[in-house]
Amino acid sequence: MTKRNPKLAALLSVIPGLGQFYNKRPIKGTIFFIFFISFISVFYSFLNIGFWGLFTLGTVPKLDDSRVLLAQGIISILLVAFAIMLYVINILDAYRNAERFNRNEEIKDPKARMVATWDKTFPYLLISPGTFLLIFVVVFPLIFMFGVAFTNYNLYNAPPRHTLEWVGLDNFKTLFTIGVWRKTFFSVITWTLVWTLVATTLQIALGLFLAIIVNYPVVKGKKFIRTVLILPWAVPSFVTILIFVALFNDEFGAINNDILQPLLGVAPAWLSDPFWAKVALIGIQVWLGFPFVFALFTGVLQSISSDWYEAADMDGASSWQKFRNITFPHVIYATAPLLIMQYAGNFNNFNLIYLFNKGGPPVSGQNAGSTDILISWVYNLTFEFNNFNMGAVVSLIIGFIVAIVAFIQFRRTSTFKDEGGL
């Protein structure tokens, strides 16, 4: 039997399909060759314009829309990346087929070969629609946002009236060196972190406390109590937030007029005072978030074997010792990834911040409200002030912070260590 040179097969595959012909696989070689010829003939013009637009962002105002050119450039990059991936597959396929032939592992029967090929490629065919959807719904917008962060896209340079320009790191310099931007950014990110840590920790603590109380053996009517405690979760958060806005209204809200004023003689300005607005937001988020945590912890608590507690009782353990050494470690071990996602979700909790008072009240000398978090500030920068480039910069920072923190925390959880993840 004549041996085949795998390196020669790979070298011949520089011209797509030629390596497959060398390996006596004419059908596969023809498919590779036709695909790449078709790719070049169909997309050559689009790729030419796409890469030109990506580098120049247009040269003639009103005629060249920089946004469209940027989008075409990104799509061109994705198409070329896809073509390169298939090109590498073409080379590797030729190399591996030659190796299999030399080891006498090549399937001789053409029909059996087609069946084997189908079995290998079928899983990839199944996931391909979802993969393409992911690319154009998630990856493409992220790359577009990344590109906008390095342009001068704002109200005064908006296309198609003007063409955009690449400005490098100027937008990042503006955020960290210009007084009003620097002051606003650090004020907003400080409140974002405080809001995330305090609100999420309180909702988790309340959910855990209630789950332990309801799960206590002497408590009667557990089903009814659990149903009542989960009800806030059943009501759409949009509706709940609007109800709380009315309750916290400075002038006619029931919290001031019917509770605090008659009982304590005080009427905090919940919507117009920065401190009390933050207190109200944290309280509302605790109300909105604790039912999910309560339901989560309830399920975990019921999975803990009673034998553990009986053994602890025999050893003379107190209630606190049983909680510290049995209940709490077991609950955290089982729910750590979901609890981390609670923090990540509140870090980007746009709905509550915007619906309550649109990030207000305003702050003198800043271009963000006193209760704006990073995500609501991005919304205002983008849709209220048309400052798209700065909105994209802040969005990149948000994504970077969330990704790094989540990655570190996931790696530290026992659940992922035990499963060999990350």
Model-derived regions: residue spans:
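Hydrophobic alpha-helical membrane segments of integral membrane proteins
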Residues: 30-31, 393
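Amphipathic alpha-helical interaction segments
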Residues: 41-45
